[in-house]
Amino acid sequence: MLGIIKTEFLKLKRFHVLLIGLIGMTLPAILSVFTQAVATPEVTTQNFDFFALFNSTIWNSATIFMPVIFTLIGGYLISREYTDNTLKNILTVPVSFQRLLFGKLLAMGILSVLFGFYSYTITLIVGVLSGISGLSAVVLCTGLLQMLGISAFTYIAVLPIIAFTIRKPGIFMGGVIVSFLFGYSAMFIKDVTMRSLYPILSGLTVMRFDTGTFMNTSEHGNLTLSMLSITVMLLLTITIVRLTNPPQAVFKRKKHKKTDILIRKRPKGR
């Protein structure tokens, strides 16, 4: 498994999709500052300090950018094996197709946390350059823990979408659209029970993120329900991957290749 993860990170160096992810994870902090600057006085945050900047960045990331970016890169990692016609070569190694998928998904999980740290760093830089006040050790630690934790939980929330859309070649972009709608819809869920169960928002509840500023509600989500929701997402992903088989086209190509070899080796009759 470690070998698969290491290989995936080596492959990522050659993929332009990683650059798309870095650009995408730069935008939440910039969007937070820009929104605060152009908004009317009635809707602006009165004391927009570093604490508010981190909260706004995390909210924008979890509901808009992370679901799309994680699904895009996660699906791309596996889709490339189909489009580059390399899957048939990989499957000759004594590694099952399901184990290969688990390795790729785990590599993307690690990458999602790294993206969270990258977004945290960008938020600090944007805040300092914008002259925002209120930077302290408590704010730094809280922002880091929440950013990393919510990155991981947001990835878990979209894992079933990734796992389902990689079952067949060429449909992972449909998963990107579904993930966007999945994250964007979270903004309109007000009921505390639904917020606790909705996978995108479950991670916010577990990390004790205050959604009051963004959802106009002071009620905290139910931690037990949120943990249950996250567990269901993991179990659902495991089930989908275990039920996923290699595309039949791979076996057909391998079979045809063996047949061609036998034909070429067959001696000519007199």
Spell out what each predicted region is.
Residues 16-18, 96-98, 102, 139, ...:
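Membrane-helix interface segments
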Residues 1-25, 170, 253-256, 270:
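Aromatic- and glycine-rich beta-strand/loop motifs that create alpha-glucan
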Residues 68-82, 87, 158-173, 231-246:
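Transmembrane alpha-helical segments in integral membrane proteins
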Residues 26-69, 102-167:
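Secretory targeting signals
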Residues 97-121, 184-211, 260, 264-269:
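Hydrophobic alpha-helical transmembrane segments of integral membrane proteins
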Residues 34-53, 176-257:
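Terminal transmembrane helical anchor/hairpin motif
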Residues 20-26, 169-187:
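Pore- or pathway-lining transmembrane helices of multi-pass membrane proteins that form conduits
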Residues 77-109:
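Helix-loop-helix units of permease transmembrane domains in multi-pass membrane transporters
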